[in-house]
Design a protein with these regions (language model features):
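PLP-dependent amino-acid enzyme catalytic core
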Residues: 1-403
Length: 403
């Protein structure tokens, strides 16, 4: 059972290995959303995510014999690092089963913390089944990433820190994958202030908790599809589900393109890298149907590999019309490339890539295709560039951008 005494005990124990991440007031998000928005930056933890809280507290409750057997868990990344780090602190051996789709940065960091990594399955649920199989075969002690009350208690210490710093908080937004963080935060928040609203946020393509609440029982999704790999869970925790039903006020879902926009917002306005799962609560702020409230958005982690980061930035710029590609037809004769460049420069467009195709038509005397990838200030500027090209008789057509 989750009790205030246990949360207070966990806070003391967890403080041995975690940072008390201070709330960051966001002028940008507050103005954008019409509420007073505070960010709880768990991406600044030593392991890059909040997961170390639950892992360390859970391992602290084990007997010396259980720790000596060796520990095992399954994780999409952040819980893996939490368990690896906590196990190292307790001098225990850790084996981590991770989906084959786990970003390389999370795999390498887990190995660097001394854990043995086994890559198996496409999603968390498949990795978890493998971890249970290995636990039975070798006698390891299993540390569940979310469906464990001790783990949820450790995660809930975030709420203790939020209330300590912002006693009059009115709303807390918390990401949901399997539900451990949401269980701990919502339960402790309601114990400290029964009137507070705690809103869970899930990816639209992995909304297992929303489906479970709607059905009144733990529900398994047939598939999950989201860029938020850390919350790509098919089945939420059954042990913690009653706490979610009791203490969570609502669930908001967000699309992948909303996460991409949130990533750009955080990088450009807060100079902060937050992974896609950690951005769920930022993306959901626009869907919160209240104004003038004190809202805390929990940023659950920041472990993102550079390749994924690059892809998200590129897609974000394309979504916001700050990068686009246009196809124009030019007479195949000297000077035409310079002329189209002058047209673009005349409206402050910035060319970042050119592709010249002489074989777009069988009549080379008629025209050649030029694909121009441009940088713009946004939609209005993009339209201004297109208008200039139209007036220059270039017959511009928007085509797919490929950088």
């Amino acid at each position: 059972m989750l009790t205030l005494d246990k949360f207070e005990e966990a806070s003391k124990i967890v403080s041995e290995v975690t940072l008390e991440t201070k709330l960051i007031y966001s002028d940008f998000l507050s103005e954008k959303c019409g509420n007073s928005i505070y960010l709880k930056p768990e991406n600044m933890q030593l392991t890059g995510a909040y997961k170390v809280r639950g892992a360390y507290y859970k391992i602290s409750t084990l007997t010396a014999e259980e720790r000596k057997k060796g520990l095992i868990t399954a994780s999409a990344g952040n819980h893996a690092q939490g368990v690896a780090y906590a196990a190292k602190k307790f001098g225990a051996k850790a084996t981590i089963v991770m989906p084959t789709t786990t970003p390389l940065i999370k795999v390498n960091r887990t190995k660097n913390l001394g854990a043995e990594v086994v890559l198996y399955g496409d999603v968390y649920d498949e990795a978890c089944a493998k971890a249970y199989e290995l636990a039975d075969a070798h006698g390891y002690t299993f540390i569940h990433p979310f469906d464990d009350l001790a783990v949820a208690t450790g995660q809930g210490t975030i709420a203790m820190e939020i209330f300590k710093e912002l006693p009059l908080v009115e709303y807390i937004l918390v990401p949901i994958g399997g539900g451990g963080l949401a269980t701990g935060v919502s339960t402790l928040a309601k114990l400290l202030n029964p009137k507070i609203k705690v809103i869970g946020v899930e990816p639209a393509g992995a909304n297992c908790m929303q489906a479970s609440i709607k059905n009144g029982k733990v529900t398994t999704l047939p598939t999950v599809n989201t860029i938020a790999d850390g919350t790509a869970v098919k089945t939420p925790g059954s042990n913690i589900f009653p706490y979610i039903q009791k203490n969570l006020d609502d669930i908001i879902t967000v699309e992948d393109d909303e996460l991409i926009a949130a990533f750009l917002d955080m990088v450009e306005n807060h100079k902060m890298v937050v992974e896609n799962s950690g951005l769920l609560t930022v993306a959901a702020l626009n869907k919160l149907n209240v104004k003038g409230k004190r809202v805390v958005s929990i940023l659950s982690g920041g472990n993102m590999d550079v390749i994924t980061m690059s892809s998200v930035v590129q897609q974000g710029l394309i979504f916001r019309d700050r990068i686009f590609t246009v196809s124009v037809l030019l007479p195949d004769k000297p000077g035409e490339l310079a002329r189209v460049a002058e047209t673009i420069a005349g409206v402050q467009g910035n060319v970042i890539k050119l592709e010249h195709n002489q074989f777009v038509t069988t009549n080379r005397n008629a025209a050649v295709e030029l694909r121009i990838t441009l940088e713009a200030f946004g939609t209005d500027h993009k339209n201004q560039i297109l208008d200039a090209l139209e007036k220059g008789d270039y017959q511009p057509k928007i085509v797919r951008t490929s950088l």
